[in-house]
């Protein structure tokens, strides 16, 4: 049954235009908006960067939706003609429980499947929707305790487990280039090797969000996006190496809706920019006999036991 799966401007897409969305066609609707790259100071003699995150802003989104129609049915031109009318068009998908206001920016690329024809349209979402007043959910019912915390909140609270990330976390950043000079009649170059400092680095975590219902999924989805785009730097704590990294959200990619039946399962990649990263030895922090780190009375800082000359 293809009726009632997609509504465009409150019109049933199958009944009125003879089209439906192909399997996997929902994936393009899911990615978080990308963050506009913030202004930054990149001091040549200091590790990392100082980004201006006082007021993070989001980029408009562009996305593809692939439709299918019967070759013997109505022409795809009916849908394209409707979407070519001025203004935005409201896409509502009942099974996802959400709607999007989109603008057509590219007409179809066609692909024949015997008795079916697939065509892909590209849309813009000019004003991505920011979540507002989102409480942190208890989405951990279907995922194990997380080794990662975002601003002190374990990712399993958002229903998220990180399936790959250790190699990305431990990968060393590139070294900043110091002052150098070449002389025409001298081999090689003269390089200031007096100090080694590191660039910031991008880290991509492969994630899986699992929820018991679409309502819970959107609650976790909105809460995670809201947490990522708050003003200021984020803090990513990694349990397996007892390190906390200053960072900020950049983008997501590779969203795939794996399951809508029973549990909702979605996989995606989360990319963060680590503003400062240096692996320069062992840090010693005060802990209890049970291995729990001791924090200061205000709950903001660990107690450093390193000896500094």
PLM features per residue range, with description:
Residues 1-309:
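Extracellular/virion structural assembly segments
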């Amino acid at each position: 049954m293809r009726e009632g799966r997609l509504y465009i401007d409150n019109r049933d897409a199958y009944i009125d235009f003879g089209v439906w969305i192909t399997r996997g066609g929902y994936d393009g609707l899911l990615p978080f908006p990308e963050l506009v790259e913030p202004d930054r100071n990149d001091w040549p003699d200091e590790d990392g960067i100082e980004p201006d995150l006082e007021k993070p802003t989001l980029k408009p989104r562009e996305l593809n939706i692939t439709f299918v129609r019967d070759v013997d049915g109505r022409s795809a031109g009916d849908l394209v003609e409707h979407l070519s009318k001025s203004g935005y068009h409201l896409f509502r998908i009942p099974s996802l429980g959400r709607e999007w206001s989109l603008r057509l920016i590219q007409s179809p690329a066609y692909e024949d499947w015997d008795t079916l024809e697939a065509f892909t349209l590209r849309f813009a979402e000019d004003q991505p929707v920011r979540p507002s007043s989102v409480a942190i959910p208890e989405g951990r019912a279907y995922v194990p305790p997380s080794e990662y915390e975002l601003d002190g909140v374990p990712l399993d609270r958002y229903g998220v487990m990180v399936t790959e990330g250790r190699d990305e976390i431990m990968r060393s950043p590139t070294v900043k280039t110091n002052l150098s000079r070449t002389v025409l009649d001298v081999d090689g170059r003269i390089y200031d090797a007096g100090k080694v400092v590191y660039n910031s680095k991008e880290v991509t975590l492969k994630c899986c969000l699992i929820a018991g219902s679409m309502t819970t999924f959107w609650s976790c989805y909105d809460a995670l996006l809201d947490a990522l785009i708050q003003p200021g730097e984020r803090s990513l704590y990694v349990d397996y190496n007892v390190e906390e990294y200053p960072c900020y959200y950049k983008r997501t990619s590779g969203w795939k809706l794996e399951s809508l039946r029973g549990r909702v399962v979605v996989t995606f990649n989360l990319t963060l920019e680590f503003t400062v990263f240096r692996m320069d030895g062992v840090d010693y922090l005060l802990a209890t006999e049970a291995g729990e780190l001791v924090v200061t009375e205000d709950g903001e800082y660990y107690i450093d036991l390193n000896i500094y000359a």
